[in-house]
A protein has these predicted regions:
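C-terminal motif of bacterial Sec signal peptides marking the signal peptidase cleavage site
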Residues: 18-20
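Bacterial signal peptide processing site
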Residues: 22-24
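Short active-site neighborhood of thiol/selenol oxidoreductases, capturing the structured segment around
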Residues: 39-54
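Typically the conserved alpha-helix immediately C-terminal to a functionally engaged Cys/Sec
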Residues: 57-74
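Thiol-based oxidoreductase modules, predominantly thioredoxin-like and allied folds used
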Residues: 70-99
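Structural micro-motif
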Residues: 99-118
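A short, hydrophobic beta-strand/beta-hairpin element that forms part of a small beta-sheet core
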Residues: 113-129
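Thiol-/selenol-based redox modules, centered on thioredoxin-like
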Residues: 133-166
């Protein structure tokens, strides 16, 4: 029995450290059990995923394996919610601040395609939405568009064309 308890504690502690192995800032639940989606960095990339979405899994692989994409997300909070989840999240998005389930937030944000990437600043202003999967090259350019504040000067399509990202 004591071996089982020790094994359970070891497995639980490993589960707590796994997100940090990805090289991304995963914000887990707070002591109250609520995950915070309020960025600590100037910009955040919120990925809304679905359990059965194969493109969500591909995006996860891209974020872990593509060197340009890994470099691009440095200094940006990479956050995730699951569209079917009842887990609680605290958010500041689109001029609203509050707490809800991940599922309710995805619905309130009008997410209908997965993965759905939402870039926003630390004040919660949504800068860019990318519904559906996009290639690592295009996503890397979109991250640059946000981080280097090109969104203040031109629309995303002009930027992607000019930079040869599409």
């Amino acid at each position: 029995m004591s071996r089982f308890v020790v094994l359970l504690m070891v497995l639980f502690s490993m589960g707590l450290t796994l997100p940090s192995c990805k090289g991304e800032k995963e914000k887990g639940p707070t002591p109250t059990g609520t995950k915070s989606l309020i960025p600590q960095s100037p910009y955040a990339m919120l990925i809304v995923e679905s359990e059965s979405c194969i493109y969500c899994k591909q995006l996860e692989k891209d974020l872990q394996r593509d060197p340009q994409l890994k470099k691009a997300v440095e200094g940006m909070d990479v956050l995730r919610i699951l569209a079917e989840s009842n887990a609680r999240v605290k958010y500041r998005l689109d001029g609203k601040e509050g707490e809800s389930t991940e599922e309710d937030l995805a619905r309130a944000l009008g997410v209908r395609a997965y993965p759905h990437i939402i870039f926003y600043n630390s004040q919660g202003e949504i800068i860019l939405r990318i519904p559906g999967y996009t290639s690592p090259k295009t996503l890397t350019c979109a991250i640059r568009y946000v981080k280097e504040e090109f969104y203040k000067k031109e629309n995303i399509n002009q930027f992607l064309q000019r930079e040869g990202c599409v």
